[in-house]
Amino acid sequence: MANKKHKASSQRWLDEHFDDEYVKKAQRLGLRSRAVFKLEEINIKDRLIKPGMKVVDLGAAPGGWSEYAVKVVGDKGQVVACDILPMDAIVGVDFLEGDFREEEVLDALLTRINGKNIDVVMSDMAANMTGNESADSARSMYLVELALDMCSQVLKPNGAFVVKVFQGAGFEDYMKATRAVFKAVKTRKPESSRARSREVYLVATGYKG
């Protein structure tokens, strides 16, 4: 029964995806994914990413957020991206393919970052959904906890963090953990985020270091 529900949900997602105005807009503009519009909207509102900044993009593939960030930071900035999945090269983006939960990959990523000098950590990571709500929620929370932990390793004082989080079990605890290390934390639901989706974005600023 659960498998049938999962298949029905997957088909509904596909139907919505191909009829989505932001998917069509991304295709028309030659962009890698509709996710770029979410980051663009957040950045216009919160001004997280600015010219000359250094940015880390976790779960970067297919590259929509990196594509946007590198245009904003320009030649004097830096974008370091990482994903377990492959990603086509983007000029100006230093991409590392691998799972940063593995020590060797994490060491390689931290070497490229070279100290706590990052202005913005951003994460659009999401776990593969199985249809089991409790298991999916736990997997999703694990990923956002990893992203928050990365902030402690690479963010400079007063740096910023933007992360996709799914509302549900563990959400309030995660908000508290984020507020403990940032001066301000806001919740954003971009217009390009599907209304039915439980996803929101936390925008955290003023990293306490």
From Swiss-Prot:
List the EC numbers from the record: 2.1.1.166
What catalytic reaction does the record list?
Answer: uridine(2552) in 23S rRNA + S-adenosyl-L-methionine = 2'-O-methyluridine(2552) in 23S rRNA + S-adenosyl-L-homocysteine + H(+)
Q: Recite the UniProt keywords alphabetically.
A: Cytoplasm, Methyltransferase, rRNA processing, S-adenosyl-L-methionine, Transferase
What Pfam families is this protein classified in? FtsJ (PF01728)
Please state where this protein is localized.
Cytoplasm
**Domain of life (superkingdom):** Bacteria
Q: What's a Gene Ontology MF term here?
A: rRNA (uridine-2'-O-)-methyltransferase activity
* Keyword Methyltransferase among UniProt keywords: yes
Task: Tell whether Methyltransferase is among the UniProt keywords.
Answer: yes
Q: Which InterPro entries does this one have?
A: RNA_methyltr_RlmE, RNA_MeTrfase_FtsJ_dom, rRNA-MeTfrase_E, SAM-dependent_MTases_sf
Q: Which SUPFAM superfamilies match?
A: S-adenosyl-L-methionine-dependent methyltransferases (SSF53335)
Give residues annotated as binding S-adenosyl-L-methionine: 63, 65, 83, 99, 124
Recorded GO CC terms:
cytoplasm
Active site location: 164
What the record says about family reads: Belongs to the class I-like SAM-binding methyltransferase superfamily. RNA methyltransferase RlmE family.
Described purpose of this protein according to its UniProt entry: Specifically methylates the uridine in position 2552 of 23S rRNA at the 2'-O position of the ribose in the fully assembled 50S ribosomal subunit.
Protein name, UniProt field: Ribosomal RNA large subunit methyltransferase E
- Which organism was this protein described from? Colwellia psychrerythraea (strain 34H / ATCC BAA-681)
Lineage of this protein's species?
Answer: Bacteria, Pseudomonadati, Pseudomonadota, Gammaproteobacteria, Alteromonadales
